[in-house]
Amino acid sequence: MDAAEVEFLAEKELVTIIPNFSLDKIYLIGGDLGPFNPGLPVDVPLWLAINLKQRQKCRLLPPEWMDVEKLEQMRDEERKEETFTPVPSPHYMEITKLLLNHASDNIPKADTIRTLIKDLWDTRMAKLRVSADSFVRQQEAHAKLDNLTLMEISSSGAFLTQALNHMYKLRTNLQPSESTQSQDF
């Protein structure tokens, strides 16, 4: 799965908007949305929120976790722990990217949030590289991927898969085949 597919999945996450228009419910295959009343918050999928924002039909409210203090705490905790810590959303990176690209005017301290999310991402990717290196060096057959997001797995998955395939080939070439006869008499 590539980054575009992961981002597509993230667009289904619900975010809160404050519409500036009136509309009864919208009936979609995935469920009903609305009603939309000016000034009253409503939860909608991210894809719809971005579409409405681009048409200047709403104001987006950032998710609860998209707060400078909370993100600083998460970043610091991630740096302290050896293992991956839980993240506030399984699509935190994609949601942040989309909201900051399309609605940064609705997000207080957007530049600081962008930096904190990037720091969190970099810390987690460094941990992932170290874990992958250790995994390959110890010739493990299984890995535990607790608290990793789909985007993090996707971004390192191709490399890790290739590395494991190469290790498998090396291991099978080094082992004596079953058809080889023993020299013992």
From Swiss-Prot:
Signal peptide span: none
Its job: Required for correct functioning of the GINS complex, a complex that plays an essential role in the initiation of DNA replication, and progression of DNA replication forks. GINS complex is a core component of CDC45-MCM-GINS (CMG) helicase, the molecular machine that unwinds template DNA during replication, and around which the replisome is built.
Residue positions where N-acetylmethionine is found in the record: M1
The name this protein goes by in its record: DNA replication complex GINS protein PSF2
Residues that bear Phosphothreonine: T180
Cross-link (Glycyl lysine isopeptide (Lys-Gly) (interchain with G-Cter in SUMO2)), chain numbering: K109
Residues with the Phosphoserine modification: S182
Keywords: Acetylation, Chromosome, DNA replication, Isopeptide bond, Nucleus, Phosphoprotein, Ubl conjugation
Phosphoprotein listed as a keyword: yes
GO CC term (a single one): GINS complex
Transmembrane segments: none
